[in-house]
């Protein structure tokens, strides 16, 4: 979350016309419910036309914001987020959904890449101290244009490069794979 917040602060510097009215978000036993309550209180303070968008650094926050927007009839406010889940995809596809875009990395790819890094580390190969995954924008318009159900596993059919990277695949992985068959 800290890196996401730092990136947001940099974005604010690049686009000073973006004005932050409020900042909320805390991890709790009911993140979605707590966020919905906090966003609901904020919506009561600002009449229509005063808030253009809500940005969530985590989809659990965004799910709560979505709930508040729907419950308060404030779907004119667009919702932008980081991370994706099957629930998020369903909410984005609902008629009249304010959830405009989510930016995410395939969670399965994160796991696979981490396993590759661990394998390389155990084998004594050089590994980086940090790694930045290439995130993909998942626009609502693309999701609603799909004729059938959409889930995280099927995003690779509509998002180019989703779930794909050859980073940290060592040549000796093929030998290990052949032995396991």
List PLM regions with ranges.
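A residue-level marker of the well-folded mature domains of exported/periplasmic proteins
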Residues: 1-181
């Amino acid at each position: 979350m800290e890196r996401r917040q730092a990136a947001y602060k940099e974005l604010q510097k690049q686009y000073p016309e973006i004005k932050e009215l409020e900042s909320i978000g805390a991890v709790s036993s009911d993140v979605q419910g707590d966020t919905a309550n906090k966003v609901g209180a904020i919506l009561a303070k600002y009449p229509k036309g005063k808030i253009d968008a809500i940005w969530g650094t985590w989809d659990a926050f965004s799910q709560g914001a979505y709930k508040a927007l729907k419950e308060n009839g404030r779907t004119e406010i667009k919702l932008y987020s980081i991370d994706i889940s099957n629930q998020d995809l369903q909410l984005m596809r609902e008629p009249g959904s304010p959830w405009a875009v989510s930016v995410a990395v395939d969670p399965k790819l994160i796991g696979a890449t981490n396993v590759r890094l661990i394998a390389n580390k155990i084998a004594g190969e050089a590994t980086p101290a940090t790694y930045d995954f290439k995130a993909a924008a998942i626009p609502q318009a693309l999701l609603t244009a799909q004729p059938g159900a959409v889930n995280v596993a099927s995003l690779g059919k509509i998002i180019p490069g989703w779930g794909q990277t050859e980073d940290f695949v060592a040549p000796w992985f093929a030998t290990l794979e052949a032995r396991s068959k």
